[in-house]
């Protein structure tokens, strides 16, 4: 670990700023630039320009923006702080990512009326398919020319669009729910799969295709997740993933919680990631609030995040081996995970969902003896991982089941929005901790494991090597833990510093208001992404200058990853699909939110 604090990696030098390129190509009069707290270049464009500009940025610009990182919307109708922004009832937000430039680009489209619409961009990015369906589902924005614009997170029979500001947010605001036998029959019928709705044929020549429901209750789909398979014998002709069974309205909840009380909800997104879920959220809030946390806070956060990375990867490793027929590894690895949880419990007081990060710091300082627990674990795990290499990764049956199965290229990964280990498994060395260091990661020495084939085996191998690199990072945290406070000295740090409560009446009132109502975060927008356990996880937060977020957008890695299933399963056998699903490493809470 280097002792000197370095600045995060800036966008690659030598490239013309994107604003100049866009102004030269399309005319400056066609853009309105918006300043944001996160520094991401943000431009407003008209819906008539969307396809032309996005196609240029992806296919004609050199170097391009090859990935549609996110696509979401904002209901602007009750927002008060919008300085310099065009009039808009709803705003569509396109978030693009360029790996060569190491730069993001945000394009916004103002939309008017109760039933706005604009052209689909699925011919440009196939990954837009699910994102546009989600926007239609939750906001009611129509996408002209979309191949199958329908509900994706909510039941087909749902009335309304929940992320509109006029949609009820609490059960007490709607009539009591009842499920009569007639209604139950209608709900079940609405879920009936009809191949024609998806452009599928029931037969080809003399062959009748079989349609198989895999899930939503099946151990190999890792949660309440349904895939409808079109089969010719045991060969997969096509597949239709069906998500939403685990949808809990996490983004809607953010609009009725204070900035502080929303932290426990973030723990439940990737429920195997623990406090790593808190990190992008609190970093984004701190960016909005202008909070600089102490060095000790940064290192504590990194150490806890890497412990949860190991815990999550151990679950992945064991269940992946189980999916392809090895039963022993999962028992060994869950035992190791309990060792990790013992450390986390000693530090945080909780195991899977400690909700321990805070705006401006962490909940408590490290307890006495934390270093001995870490030191023991650093001695314990490496020989265990070496043993697992022998019994699992070197097993010829596991290799036969996973090598060359479920593979994709770097170009396909970018096309579909793949990030994290899934992207590095096909040869691209891209990790937010290196390319865009946050929370002091620039001070740590570690390598980025990269494979070449993009198959099931390589996706597993990358995660195993990541555990070894996480151990390196944790050891540096142990050896170089800075002294100092576990909480920033800032008025918006939440909860505020207790020792100041009784200083005078003003600090007492400030403490009371901050704890009871929550901090008032300045108006603005910020998006922070991190290298989470399953890929890149981002929180895009909008404050309207109140104690609650105006908009909470959660970009999870698992959502686009599952959208790739039809691409990588066509032509394979059903057992190969089971291996592929296990290698993606997803949990449905991360997909459905």
Swiss-Prot record:
DNA-binding in keyword set: no
Reactions catalysed: a quinone + NADH + 5 H(+)(in) = a quinol + NAD(+) + 4 H(+)(out)
Gene3D superfamilies membership: Cytochrome-c3 Hydrogenase, chain B (1.10.645.10), NADH:ubiquinone oxidoreductase, 30kDa subunit (3.30.460.80)
Its membrane topology: Peripheral membrane protein
Main location: membrane
A GO MF label: NADH:ubiquinone reductase (non-electrogenic) activity
GO cellular component: NADH dehydrogenase complex; plasma membrane
Span list, region NADH dehydrogenase I subunit D: 208-593
Keywords, sorted A to Z: Cell inner membrane, Cell membrane, Membrane, Multifunctional enzyme, NAD, Quinone, Translocase, Transport, Ubiquinone
Subcellular localization(s) per the UniProt record: Cell inner membrane
Enzyme's top EC category: translocase
EC number: 7.1.1.-
PROSITE patterns registered for this protein in UniProt: COMPLEX1_49K
Disulfide bonds: none
Family affiliation: In the N-terminal section; belongs to the complex I 30 kDa subunit family.
PANTHER family: NADH-QUINONE OXIDOREDUCTASE SUBUNIT C_D, NADH-UBIQUINONE OXIDOREDUCTASE 49 KDA SUBUNIT
Chain's role: NDH-1 shuttles electrons from NADH, via FMN and iron-sulfur (Fe-S) centers, to quinones in the respiratory chain. The immediate electron acceptor for the enzyme in this species is believed to be ubiquinone. Couples the redox reaction to proton translocation (for every two electrons transferred, four hydrogen ions are translocated across the cytoplasmic membrane), and thus conserves the redox energy in a proton gradient.
The protein's name in its UniProt record: NADH-quinone oxidoreductase subunit C/D
Native species: Nitrosococcus oceani (strain ATCC 19707 / BCRC 17464 / JCM 30415 / NCIMB 11848 / C-107)
Taxon lineage: Bacteria, Pseudomonadati, Pseudomonadota, Gammaproteobacteria, Chromatiales
